[in-house]
Each structure stands twice: as C-alpha cells, then as structure tokens.
Amino acid sequence: MDEKKLKQEDCYEDNLGQGVLTLTTKRIAFDKTRSRIMDFSKHMGETILDIPLSDVTHTWREGLLMKKACISARITNGEQTYKFGVFNVGGWVDDIQDAIDELD
C-alpha cells in the first residue's frame, strides 16, 4: 500500500512547541516550523516526530477550553504521550483511529 497524506495542520504540541502535524496512511509526523515576523513567512524545519501508526497504542481527546488531540506511542524505552492543539480535535482523533484500523 502506498503512503498517502490524509490530514495536515499547523498545531502546538505541549513539549515540542509550534509545528505542522501530518497524518498519513502509515504514520504521524510532526515538523518543527520557524516563523519570521517581518514578512509573516513560515518555514518547515526538521521532522522531530515520525511515529508509525502501528506504534500508536491509544488515542483520546482532553481539555475543556483548550482541547487537545492526544496519542500514546511505543518508543525504544517505553511509551510517550503527545498532546496536540489542533482546530478540530474530534476529527483528528477519529481520523487517527480510522487510519490505525485500516492497517489491520
């Protein structure tokens, strides 16, 4: 199966900062962004998160005012939780879970 981009959005992750969250048919990636205030340009930086969907163990939403799309993923020394501030939290959580279910 070829990898296809399903969703992409500017977001903020609690520990990683500002960036672009991308969901594909095979993985979740987070690319750091750099902004320049003088000309309002935004530049993609390095990919600092690249998680195969098969390593995602749990997806959920949390927050009352500042809602977050959350995932837990297996990493080399255990498990890590990431919390992304995205526009449509429910849509992101559902789409991530649907992409994981499609792997099976």
Language-model region placement:
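Anionic N-terminal interaction surfaces
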Residues: 1-26, 31-33, 42-49, 63, ...
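Short acidic, Gly/Pro-enriched loop/turn segments at secondary-structure junctions
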Residues: 35-40, 55-73
